């Protein structure tokens, strides 16, 4: 930090000449080091280190309030999110069988985790809260609205979800009753038929009150107006839209339908049968310049929609929240492979009794979830051609089962077995039984996705020209926000790039991203203070 500039009041101050604070902006010089690798015919790796200098710019002025619009506002996740914000904002304590509880955001990485800053004078690690390094919006400042195909207010939705303690529900009743979802879009072919009984709050009704899939462009325009009205009525500068509604079936990606931006928009106008409700919401958000996050496993981001985001410069992220079984899998599978142990089969079984499980009991919707859950180990397998190759086999037998069991409600039961090959024909079996309250794991992830998406909207960068230091203009990130992969089962990537699923790699990327912005080097564990004389 230069002496003639004063840093904003934060918990962390870095003494460095890499950072300059000016007019509510933080400018940081950063040298990105990597290595380009080629493999010769003889099997030798030729490695060439590379360096590219950048200047990053962060707008230090976070919004006083952030608009959040959820598709599926009246579902388990939506009602739990609103309840958590209200409970924390108003400090609503409540009784449980274990005594009085204070509200918190446990399970949220941005609110309740720490990261290593460095060491103290004795060589001990020093940690700071994740959200203390740079200004981040607080979930207490969320202004939440959204859409749902069911018209229940959020107190009714909270009761129906059976997620929160009874006393907390009663203490939040007055405030939750005031929140009512906007009418949503319901195309019956895309979700399970058993959801039809809930669909009493839809914009796509004909003159006789029957659901119609005609007029999809009109539906898109309606969603755009909803976003505009929400911003205006609440005096919001920023809004983020997130899908936490039912899992849809996969859509067919077809030339002339959804393969390009132009074809996609025309297909919406033509009421094409492969235009799903999530496509309408995503396109409307992108056209409004509002970031859109897909929290479910369906393939909303067809090529035409990604092109639209590129054209409009609007952030998108997906797919599917990574909360329990899959998050553990992304850690355990990486551990086994990095240890030189070869997983040969992974069997994953779930049963749950909430509406998510009810919808997933239909084969087409289950297939969407199966695809997102199974892809989590792909890059981990590809990272080790000693264990996985043409001779030994390149695949892991990976089975996923999800069953609906109404009595267990939101307490999802997950059972996994990892069967691995050891040296000299030996085998290892790891069996895991995990019971988690699904929505209380998923809701903090939604909070993190929203906080970090807003943060990324305030970051820009430019490459440093070695000849003309002031050349170039600041650019935003590429529209697909892969920095958010930590919270997503099947991370959407830039076309031509492969997703990173390993949880530790994803967390490291986030930590180093924050560190570079405040002028700290990337994290390492060399610990020379101890290991060298």
Curated annotation (Swiss-Prot):
**Localisation:** Cytoplasm
Q: What is its EC number?
A: 5.5.1.4
| Superkingdom of source | Eukaryota
Q: What induces it?
A: Induced by valproate. Repressed by inositol.
Binding of NAD(+): at which residues?
74-77, 148, 184-185, 195-196, 198, 244-247, 295-296, 320-321, 323, 354-356, 369, 409-410, 438-439
Phenotypic effect of disruption? Inositol auxotrophy.
- Which one of the record's GO molecular function terms can you name? inositol-3-phosphate synthase activity
Known outcome of mutating residue 369 to A: Loss of activity
How does this protein's activity depend on the pH of its environment? Answer: Optimum pH is 7.2-7.7.
Where is the PTM Phosphothreonine found along the chain?
48
- Does the record carry Phosphoprotein as a key word? yes
Record's comment on post-translational modification: Phosphorylation at Ser-184 and Ser-374 is associated with a decrease in activity. Increasingly phosphorylated in presence of valproate.
- GO BP field: inositol biosynthetic process; phospholipid biosynthetic process
**Can the keyword NAD be found in this entry's annotation?**
yes
Chain positions found as Phosphoserine: 177, 184, 296, 368, 374
Record Pfam families: Inos-1-P_synth (PF01658), NAD_binding_5 (PF07994)
Class of the enzyme per the UniProt entry, highest EC level: isomerase
Activity regulation, in the record's words, is: Competitively inhibited by myo-2-inosose 1-phosphate, which is also an intermediate in the catalytic reaction. Competitively inhibited by 2-deoxy-myo-inositol 1-phosphate (dMIP), 1-deoxy-1-(phosphonomethyl)-myo-2-inosose (DPMI), dihydroxyacetone phosphate (DHAP), 6-deoxy-D-glucose 6-(E)-vinylhomophosphonate, 6-deoxy-D-glucitol 6-(E)-vinylhomophosphonate, 2,6-dideoxy-D-glucose 6-(E)-vinylhomophosphonate and 2,6-dideoxy-D-glucitol 6-(E)-vinylhomophosphonate. Inhibited by 2-deoxyglucitol 6-phosphate (dgtolP).
User: What keywords tag this UniProt record?
Assistant: Cytoplasm, Inositol biosynthesis, Isomerase, Lipid biosynthesis, Lipid metabolism, NAD, Phospholipid biosynthesis, Phospholipid metabolism, Phosphoprotein
Question: What GO CC terms are in its UniProt record?
Answer: cytoplasm
Cofactor(s), names only, from the UniProt record: NAD(+)
Membership in a protein family: Belongs to the myo-inositol 1-phosphate synthase family.
Q: How does the record describe its quaternary structure?
A: Homotetramer.
Q: What does this protein do?
A: Key enzyme in myo-inositol biosynthesis pathway that catalyzes the conversion of glucose 6-phosphate to 1-myo-inositol 1-phosphate in a NAD-dependent manner. Rate-limiting enzyme in the synthesis of all inositol-containing compounds.
User: What PANTHER family does the entry give?
Assistant: MYO-INOSITOL-1 PHOSPHATE SYNTHASE (PTHR11510)
User: What is the official name of this protein in its record?
Assistant: Inositol-3-phosphate synthase
**Which species is listed as the source?**
Saccharomyces cerevisiae (strain ATCC 204508 / S288c)
